[in-house]
Amino acid sequence: MFDPTDRPRVFGLPLGADFPRALVDGLIARHKDQLPETLARVTVIVNTQRMARRIRDLFDAGPPMLLPRIQVITDLGQGAVGAGIPPAVPALRRRLELSQLIGTLLEKEPDLASRAALFDLSDSLAALMDEMHGEGVSPGAISALDVSDQSGHWERTKTFISIIKKYFDGATSEPDVETRQRLVVSALAAHWASNPPKDPVIVAGSTGSRGTTMMLMQAVAKLSQGALILPGFDFDLPEDVWTKLDDPLLSEDHPQYRYRKLMLALGLRPADISNWGADIGLDVAARNRLVSLSLRPAPFTDAWLAEGPALPDIAGATQGVTLVHARHPRDEALAVALRLRQAAEDGQTAALITPDRMLTRRVTAALDQWNIAPDDSAGQPLHLSPPGRFLRHVAQLFSQKMSAELLFTLLKHPLCHSGGSRNQHLLFTRDLELYLRRTAPPYPKESDFRAWASQ
């Protein structure tokens, strides 16, 4: 599939490209004059199940052909490579273990935090553990940091982090999800080093934002038939600006920082990154140049004045870009929902990209009034799902005195008596509600129910 080369093979796709479509079109174009089975020998590793489904849907749209193997990064450990690696410990079990350790620490140092913050601290520490495992950072590396702190906060922080040391010393025997994923990638890289695959292996759509993913990308890029396809690569960024991204203190928040780190690890220059091939149009190309210039790191912001006036067709570059100043969060969500509704009416594909989960819930609620159910890639929290809400109502019966309001909220829930005789159940519920509203106190007792049932 790929011509021989003496350097790692890395491709990029610019912002504005339909990444799954460009990936599929590029694979088909590169196998146009080859035997049908050659495409089936290609392995494509992607980030998410959503990406895998979209790629399969694009292939299924035709023409008929043998498809490549499409794998999700998190599924790499399901094969022979992960056979000797212990299964991951459930996240809930790990959080409960951490809550016990934090509880013991709070007993020894009660001024560290209140007992009410126990589970919040457990969640925070578990998230930190996941990131440390993913990046390959041990508690010892954090303790060795030279942080000038006269107030003692850093010492207390190190004490807090030290309680998870045992999960790093014995991480391979009872690994969490991130640790197991890193072990799988390490084993896979070692296997490829001694038995390199002859067929093409492609990692597509990954940015290397996680340390484990970066390990996999480096291992694949060094294969004779391996390749990386980077999304949102900035082909307009000058090479002298790329060199200023080496300092993490100044540039770690830049969207191209991880790509710079990857290029340094592979010994590549920006000019070595080839365009996989995608027609993004003149307006999108102009917008990319504008965005690239606006995101220059601090030492190069003077380029705004030097290069800004030379940008062609600013009006075309910003066509379709709207700035909305919302007075309230509700107005913000409604504006987004109205635009998504318009896209649905026009038959367009639209996406809301935001880290704000409250905003997504407000937008979902606004769309619900038009019977539009968006596909949320982050999923729905269990406690907000219909079964979760029902179980929360049931749990309230054990934690507080039963009121008529709580009782009927539970009885009228769609999951309460959801069988074929639900109509009869709702009739009984209505009769009971009318009886209790007329004759019983706000907190009914067993005798009140017996009196109603005897009628």
Predicted regions located by residue number:
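Polyanion-engaging groove/track-forming segments
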Residues: 1-455
